[in-house]
């Protein structure tokens, strides 16, 4: 579970995130929508403990990410817009390295299986990451989450720049991870992808979470209309 309790962040007296209360249950995919500067990435960074909160708490699996940093990180996987991998290593070698940092011990056969589960072909797993497309790098990121058995997954604009086929494959993998019990928080500008992937969406504006909706209750046109209404308020 991911939980924000009166979570806020200010810089020199200017609020980047006003007090946020949000709970994302296991099996949920919550998509944060909003313009640049709305507070989406700030929210992600607070859960990652990349920046300290000005007030409140961010919790992963009930563990405060500041007070229980090492323990909470073991429950977590993170996929940014550009997955940071070592270009001179293969996809398999990258997966082996990053899972070992998290304390995982897997055979190369098991690691290849995680990559295959994430949609990366066996032949591609043995290629250097420098030759990978963005979609292939994202699959390595998903494989890391699978190998860690992550209970929470944070994503910041993960489908930006992906072609429709790769975006659909990525969404399918997120749904598979959520079905296994992971709580997922994804920041995105893509209304279509949020509707197709998320179980809930939240709209952020000027550091406030101004509205949340269940995607099952909205059509694509409904979400676009509601989003634009909030942006023009």
Identify the residue ranges that each predicted region occupies:
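Conserved ABC ATPase "signature" region
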Residues: 96, 100-103, 108-124
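Helix N-cap at the start of a conserved alpha-helix in ABC-type nucleotide-binding domains
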Residues: 164-166
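H-loop/switch region of ABC-family ATPase nucleotide-binding domains
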Residues: 188-189
């Amino acid at each position: 579970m991911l939980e924000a309790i009166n979570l806020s962040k200010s810089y020199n007296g200017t609020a980047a995130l006003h007090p946020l209360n949000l709970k994302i249950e296991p099996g949920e995919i919550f998509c944060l929508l909003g313009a640049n500067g709305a507070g989406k990435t700030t929210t992600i960074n607070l859960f990652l403990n990349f920046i300290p909160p000005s007030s409140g708490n961010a919790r992963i699996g009930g563990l405060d990410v500041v007070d229980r940093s090492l323990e909470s990180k073991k429950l977590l996987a993170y996929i940014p817009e550009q997955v940071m991998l070592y270009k001179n290593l293969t996809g398999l070698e990258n997966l082996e390295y990053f899972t070992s940092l998290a304390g995982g011990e897997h055979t190369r056969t098991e690691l290849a299986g995680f990559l295959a589960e994430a949609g990366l072909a066996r032949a591609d797993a043995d290629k250097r990451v420098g030759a990978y497309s963005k979609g292939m790098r994202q699959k390595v990121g998903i494989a890391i989450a699978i190998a860690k058995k992550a209970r929470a997954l944070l994503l910041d604009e993960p489908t930006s720049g992906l072609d429709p086929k790769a975006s659909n494959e990525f969404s399918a993998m997120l749904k598979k991870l959520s079905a296994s019990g992971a709580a997922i928080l994804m920041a995105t500008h893509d209304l279509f992808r949020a509707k197709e992937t998320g179980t809930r969406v939240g709209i952020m504006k000027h550091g406030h979470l101004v509205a949340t909706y269940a995607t099952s209750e909205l059509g694509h046109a409904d979400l676009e209309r509601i989003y634009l209404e909030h942006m023009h308020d």
